[in-house]
Amino acid sequence: MAFSKRVYRSLPFELVEEILKKTPAESLNRFKSTCKQWYGIITSKRFMYNHLDHSPERFIRIDDHKTVQIMDPMTGIFSDSPVPDVFRSPHSFASMVHCDGLMLCICSDSSYERTREANLAVWNPVTKKIKWIEPLDSYYETDYFGIGYDNTCRENYKIVRFSGPMSFDDTECEIYEFKSDSWRTLDTKYWDVYTQCRGVSVKGNMYWIADTKEKFILRFDFSMETFKNVCVCPPIGCTGRLGCFSGDRLPLLLQDTDFGGEEEVSTDIAVWLTNKLSDEVVSFTKYFNVTSPHLPLLQCHGDMARPGYFIGDHKNILAWCEGEVEEDDKWYTCITLYQIDQCGIRKQIETGRHRSFRYLDPFICSYVYVPSLIPVPE
């Protein structure tokens, strides 16, 4: 290490910064103690955001409330670590939303009752920091949450919460600002969000599929603190999955299923894509189809995990998901990384396998995630 320090001290500052910019966030977190120069670079806000904007996407997977797995989808290599103790019962995961390497964790108390407990947290898996968010009054199990930031100041992170269709109360919409550590109530109409589709945070704003007479993309602008109907969705049918493409576009993955006996059978995949979300008029166009037998189910089904996937630049899909196989009268859950293009499955790597006790419905979910050193806002 002493030799390494002497070498890097002799390098120009700009070159050291460029080398560190290409280093994974997990390694940078350890390198902060190497020397004062590195610490100064790594902890500067300008560097942290520059590093974040040039970092590749990963999959993050929570396995039955016990293990956090983070995978590089290009290599299939993944690391795992225990789920933080504070996210074990009674504060177990229900869902998450990603923004700038920060995970907004919506936790469950396994009831549909109002709760005044802090069941909402922001977590950075790299730095291991966690902040619990106390409710203004109470949270409800069917509330919708999103995380983003004011585009005039990226460090000004905010959380939006609005009531779902089972709240039985007047429509509630609240916004939490980390800078003031407080909630405010917003005056807004009721929104019926499509519950089968997760919301995504893109460029500081939240996007959901919402439903009135037809399904459309609903945006919450954290700068203006307003909702907006962005564009109409293509016919979704039973399922639809939103994601992020090239940092400023929304892909929509559609895949319906047939039932073969008691099992769900995957059918063809259609991927639609918006133009840039900053354009004056936003709309979906068909990006590509996948017509092939034996495709994996890229949606939540039965007691399997919610799969993680993202759309590549070459009309391809990378997906990390589960399937069941039967061997010697025993059922096993296989976790598999798929590379899929328009011709079908190009490559698949089994990354794990364990005994499956059917219908016990374990909690397992996957998300697209970018590791970062962005500090959890205080």
From Swiss-Prot:
Q: State the superkingdom.
A: Eukaryota
Which positions, given as ranges, span the membrane? none
Q: Which InterPro entries match?
A: F-box-assoc_dom_typ1 (IPR006527), F-box-assoc_interact_dom (IPR017451), F-box-like_dom_sf (IPR036047), F-box_dom (IPR001810), Gal_Oxase/kelch_b-propeller (IPR011043), SCF_F-box_component (IPR050796)
What would be one Pfam family of this protein?
F-box
Q: Which residues form the F-box domain?
A: 5-52
What protein am I looking at? Putative F-box only protein 15
Species of the source: Arabidopsis thaliana (Mouse-ear cress)
Q: Which gene encodes it?
A: FBX15
